[in-house]
Design a protein with these regions (language model features):
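Phosphate/NTP-binding elements of NTP-utilizing enzymes
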Residues: 1-336, 341-344, 349-350, 358-364
Length: 364
């Protein structure tokens, strides 16, 4: 993918920039940006800005490129990713690209509370403002909980409740921090709340063949998020046979810089053969995990995948927030996760939450 240095945008626009009579490079960039198969990564690398001690250019990490790959190539994706790892930013980036790339679509963003849902909408609006002006689809309606583009695509944000999809035919539903839905209730009530929401969105997605993206850090091993995650990482069919691998292309040894997905190695090789001779040698087919038994693709990323989070950072964060919080929020381990520990010279299995309580009592 050729790299461009594009001027940041100047805010919301009501009329599309006319590319006629301008340098042909602008039309070339437009075509690359809104290519249905490969445009999402181009958009992320060239057009997205985010707030991080000011407005900074979004530079997707390897796991974020994988997120974009999965969202663009699969109907259902569940992501177990640690705190402050950019999972929401990456999802919002994809949603903004999709909203401008495709016409007459409904997109629903949900989170465990209205405030969180509105915050995610504000991320999309900020990205739109700084997107290069000549790549923007004009916005004709803008309020706190909705955006309407001139191409007919509508984006809404709502709390994660069974009423959320009402009145919509969603092409995408994005559920952020899904494990925290019903978090102030008992474990059983939280599960019921999550199941009611899932039951409400399933018919709508089935009717539109829409996409479902779920991201979260973990809470427990009894909620619906955990069950969806467990089904997604189960790579065997109902007869307990291994599901066949999918294939992606590495380019110059880097995976996910190419965003094409293939279901057989033969298809991947055939695609490489269509490339110019000087390009063929740069590519190689790589086996990757398929969707799980429940039809969800999955991605896991803890703090170690972020090059900005060092051992020194971990040490400071452990002192600041404690072991249980760190394990759940950054290592993606819930309080229900069972770990093996040495107690009085004997190996024992213990829930992480119980271990933290025991350590706290010993230190008091």
């Amino acid at each position: 993918m050729q790299k461009y240095n594009l001027q940041p945008g100047t805010g919301f626009i009501k009329r599309r920039v006319n590319l006629a009579g301008q340098d042909p490079i602008y039309q070339q960039i437009w075509d690359e940006c809104y290519n249905p198969k490969t445009g999402a990564l181009f958009f992320a690398e060239h057009c997205c800005y985010t707030r991080k001690n000011g407005i900074v250019k979004y530079n997707p990490r390897d796991y974020q490129k994988e997120m974009l790959f999965l969202m663009n190539n699969h109907q259902s994706v569940v992501s177990l990713i640690g705190r402050q790892m950019g999972k929401t930013v990456t999802s919002c980036c994809y949603i903004l690209w999709y909203a401008m790339a495709f016409s007459e679509k409904d997109i629903l963003i949900t989170s465990f509370g209205e405030k969180s849902a509105v915050e995610n909408m504000s991320k999309i609006k900020s990205m739109y403002e700084y997107c290069p002006d000549f790549l923007k689809i004009p916005i004709i309606k803008n309020n706190e909980t909705s955006l309407v583009f001139s191409n007919g695509t509508r984006v809404y944000c709502r709390p994660t409740t069974p009423k959320a999809p009402r009145g919509l035919s969603p092409a995408i539903i994005y559920c952020d921090e899904f494990a925290f839905v019903g978090g102030n209730s008992s474990a059983q009530k939280s599960l019921e709340n999550q199941q009611e929401f899932y039951a409400a969105i399933s018919p709508a997605l089935s009717a539109t063949h829409g996409k479902l993206f779920i991201t979260s850090t973990p809470v427990s091993e009894t909620d619906l998020f955990y069950r969806l995650w467990a089904g997604a990482i189960n790579k065997t069919d109902d007869n307990n046979l291994d599901l066949p691998k999918d294939y992606a292309l590495s380019k110059d040894g880097v995976l996910y810089d190419d965003q094409n997905l293939f279901h057989t190695k033969e298809d991947a090789v055939a695609f490489i053969e269509t490339l110019p001779e000087d390009e063929k040698k740069k590519y190689a087919p790589i086996a990757i995990e398929p969707e799980g038994n429940n039809g969800f693709a999955s991605i896991f990323a803890d703090w170690t995948k972020d090059p900005e989070k060092t051992i020194e950072w971990k040490s400071k964060e452990l002192k600041r927030s404690g072991a249980e919080f760190f394990a759940r929020e950054y290592e993606c381990l819930s309080g229900e996760t069972v770990v093996s520990v040495m107690i009085d010279g004997k190996c024992a299995d213990m829930k992480l939450g119980d271990l933290y309580t025991k350590l706290s009592q010993n230190n008091s």
